[in-house]
Amino acid sequence: MVQAVSDNLISNAWVISCNPLALEVPERIGSTYFCFGGAIFILVAPLTNLVYNEDIVSQTRLYIYYRGSRDSRACMLDIVTLVDVSKRSKLVLLLQIYFFSF
């Protein structure tokens, strides 16, 4: 039910960034996201350190994870957006898309 973003998952990620200078993959995201099937939700961790940042767009990174193989009848696409809102806080948005073939 609760799943942490692992280093192995990050190393296999496709990285798209709003900031061309920030295409590197960080060693660890360090936030936990909750897995609800096909749900869209927002997790702010930790809430107490959330600080508004005017330069938030340049600090946004988008990670796309593909789970499944060409032979499988179902696959899942995780789209994780990581925003650094302060030195200790990160805003994580997760969109899970499921594909089924009949």
UniProtKB/Swiss-Prot annotation:
Source superkingdom: Eukaryota
Predominant location category: membrane
Keyword Transmembrane helix on entry: yes
GO cellular component, one term: membrane
Compartments it resides in: Membrane
Keywords linked to the UniProt accession: Membrane, Transmembrane, Transmembrane helix
Record field: transmembrane: 29-52
Bilayer topology annotation: Single-pass membrane protein
Note: Partially overlaps YAP1802.
The name this protein goes by in its record: Putative uncharacterized protein YGR242W
Species for this entry: Saccharomyces cerevisiae (strain ATCC 204508 / S288c) (Baker's yeast)
